[in-house]
A protein has these predicted regions:
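Catalytic-core region of carbohydrate-active enzymes that cleave or remodel glycosidic bonds
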Residues: 1-11
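Histidine/acidic-residue-rich catalytic or RNA/ligand-binding cores of hydrolases
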Residues: 21-30
Length: 176
């Protein structure tokens, strides 16, 4: 609605439609918004939930809960830089999402995606959830590893290395 009020006629969403997160869902939602720019927040939410259910089956609500948490982690970051591209950051891992949010919530995020994997009723749903899990494990490692290493927290470093190994094992098994 904001873009339309500014005179924008459409949006070219330059992003992958596949991948390890929820890109296909985001892409479909934006396409729907191009055709239905007056969609209410409630209609948008209902459409997102419908798309998530198609992609993830019974575990769709776990993925929706994760998206809420992921959004919060982006909304609470302490800087507006994008992957250090415009500078001004002390720590590269501190600029896309709030790493301190991940300190207290990554365990729940991982539990949510593992539950979505468990609830998958088809091979495709399981693959989608496992691909999403790689994103979640990697983001957890990315946001926490360097600070844990700098603090000498070997227990956390070992846990994070296990997360990384899990993600890499899944990627290999999925053919990546």
């Amino acid at each position: 609605r904001f873009f339309r009020e500014c005179g924008v006629k459409g949006v070219f969403y330059n992003a992958d439609t596949e991948g390890f997160g929820v890109e296909q869902i985001r892409y479909q939602l934006l396409a729907e918004l191009n055709w239905r720019p007056d969609m209410t927040d409630e209609e948008y939410e209902a459409l997102m939930c419908e798309l998530l259910e198609k992609e993830y089956g019974e575990g769709w609500d776990c993925v929706r809960d994760y998206i809420t948490m992921w959004t919060k982690a982006q909304d609470t970051r302490r800087t507006n830089a994008c992957w250090h591209a415009i500078g001004g950051n002390k720590a590269m891992w501190d600029n896309r999402i709030d790493p301190y949010y991940y300190d207290t919530h990554s365990g729940e995020m991982i539990s949510l995606v593992e539950e979505a994997i468990r609830l998958a009723s088809s091979e495709l749903q399981q693959k989608r959830a496992e691909m999403l899990s790689c994103h979640i494990y990697y983001t957890t490692v990315y946001t926490r590893y360097y600070r844990a290493e700098a603090a000498g927290d070997t227990a956390l470093v070992n846990t994070l290395e296990g997360y990384y190994a899990t993600a890499m094992d899944r990627l290999r098994r999925l053919g990546y």
